[in-house]
């Protein structure tokens, strides 16, 4: 079947009222970015969809790319024809004859957006259905479960013929809900949290804490690889790598062992907040799941959160670990997360961390040392990497040989 258009339908954008144009433009920009390698494509948008003109490009790889774009409810490969009865009948017959097999059943569904068209939807179904039946051998009607579902959308400027809707990623276009900092470790949780935040329209920048020589370059590369996985869904992502060794060493020197985990998380959150302020972001995202580990009890989160008034977004707070792992598999981060390279969250883990730390105690322990200059120094020494999804380009290069 030689399709010449793709019809892209919005998800929740349709409910956004006065901000609708902004959301549609964000989605259009992201679609253009994702499909930038397909140079012949042209785009048009209106109130309820974006139309992609293929101009000879292969629709299959384009469809695969569109499936991961947040803000798309569904899309359809389409054939365009003129909005007159004879042209529609001819295009519908040609389309059915290209896709059907001997003995198939079919059904016609018409959506008539152009109300001045000469026939209504039911009349069109009968007219087109009869024309197709008369001119196609061994084809019968089945309105409940057809093998071929011919869909006709009549608009004033053009009519589009499609056969199926492809489910999109849903959610909101990346960037339409503002920017936030993702505290990214090498585990399962934080990449999934980042994915969920992007699905709600947040443009993420990742913050990773790196503690050489206790953590290796391979652990750092693991986080870069995880960021690359996420970039497949949100375009390029800035990854801020924070030197954290001196701060961790001071924590373990000054803070009682069972409070070191709490203090470490507080310092991380302080640094993430300083970066957030520099980057004009509005929130911090974490992969915390209630009760999963000692630092994720309500008491721990209360003591840790006390260092900032910035909103903390926790997409996974009520999600079970097994469900998080299943989601990691689905979005493609699982195989990277299982690599056995320790990050700074695991190398200094005490044998019996406090599950119900007291805020006044951790504040008193931290007062024994002046952490603030070290936090500022860490922020100044950040290494920032712009991460793109290079896997697609590498796969395309490999296909040449």
Curated annotation (Swiss-Prot):
Ligand binding (ATP): 183-184, 208-209, 265, 287, 296
THUMP domain span: 60-165
Cellular localization per UniProt: Cytoplasm
Keyword vocabulary terms for this entry: ATP-binding, Cytoplasm, Nucleotide-binding, RNA-binding, Thiamine biosynthesis, Transferase, tRNA-binding
EC number: 2.8.1.4
Record function comment: Catalyzes the ATP-dependent transfer of a sulfur to tRNA to produce 4-thiouridine in position 8 of tRNAs, which functions as a near-UV photosensor. Also catalyzes the transfer of sulfur to the sulfur carrier protein ThiS, forming ThiS-thiocarboxylate. This is a step in the synthesis of thiazole, in the thiamine biosynthesis pathway. The sulfur is donated as persulfide by IscS.
Protein name as annotated: Probable tRNA sulfurtransferase
Organism field: Bacillus pumilus (strain SAFR-032)
Lineage: Bacteria, Bacillati, Bacillota, Bacilli, Bacillales
């Amino acid at each position: 079947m030689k399709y010449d258009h793709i019809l892209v339908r919005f998800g929740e954008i349709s409910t956004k009222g006065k901000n609708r144009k902004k959301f549609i433009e964000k989605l259009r920009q992201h679609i253009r970015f994702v499909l930038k390698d397909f140079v012949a494509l042209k785009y048009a948008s209106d109130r309820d969809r974006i139309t992609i003109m293929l101009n000879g490009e292969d629709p299959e790889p384009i469809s695969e790319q569109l499936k991961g774009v947040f803000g798309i409810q569904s899309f359809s490969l389409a054939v365009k024809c003129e909005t007159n009865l004879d042209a529609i009948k001819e295009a519908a017959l040609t389309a059915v004859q290209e896709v059907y097999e001997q003995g198939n059943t079919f059904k016609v569904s018409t959506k008539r957006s152009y109300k001045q068209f000469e026939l209504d939807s039911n009349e069109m179904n009968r007219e087109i259905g009869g024309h197709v039946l008369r001119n196609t051998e061994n084809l019968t009607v089945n309105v409940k479960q057809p093998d071929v579902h011919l869909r006709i959308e009549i608009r004033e400027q053009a009519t589009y013929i499609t056969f199926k809707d492809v489910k999109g990623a849903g959610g909101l276009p990346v960037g339409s809900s503002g920017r936030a900092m993702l505290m990214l470790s090498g585990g399962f949780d934080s990449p999934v949290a980042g994915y969920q935040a992007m699905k709600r329209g947040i443009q993420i920048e990742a913050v990773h804490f790196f503690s050489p020589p206790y953590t290796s370059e391979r652990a750092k590369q693991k986080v870069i690889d995880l960021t690359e996985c996420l970039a497949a869904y949100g375009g390029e992502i800035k990854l801020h790598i924070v030197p954290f060794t001196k701060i961790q060493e001071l924590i373990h020197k000054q803070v009682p062992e069972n409070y070191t985990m709490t203090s470490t998380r507080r310092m991380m959150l302080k640094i993430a907040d300083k970066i957030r302020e520099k980057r004009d972001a509005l929130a911090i995202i974490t992969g915390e799941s209630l009760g999963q580990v000692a630092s994720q009890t309500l008491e721990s989160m209360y003591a840790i959160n006390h260092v900032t008034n910035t909103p903390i977004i926790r997409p996974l707070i009520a999600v079970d670990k097994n469900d998080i792992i299943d989601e990691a598999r689905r979005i493609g981060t699982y195989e990277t997360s299982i690599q056995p390279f320790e990050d700074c969250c695991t190398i200094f883990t005490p044998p019996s961390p406090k599950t119900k730390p007291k805020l006044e105690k951790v504040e008193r322990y931290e007062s024994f040392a002046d952490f603030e200059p070290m936090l500022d120094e860490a922020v100044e020494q950040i290494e920032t990497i712009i991460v793109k999804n290079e896997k697609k380009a590498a796969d395309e290069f490999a296909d040449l040989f």
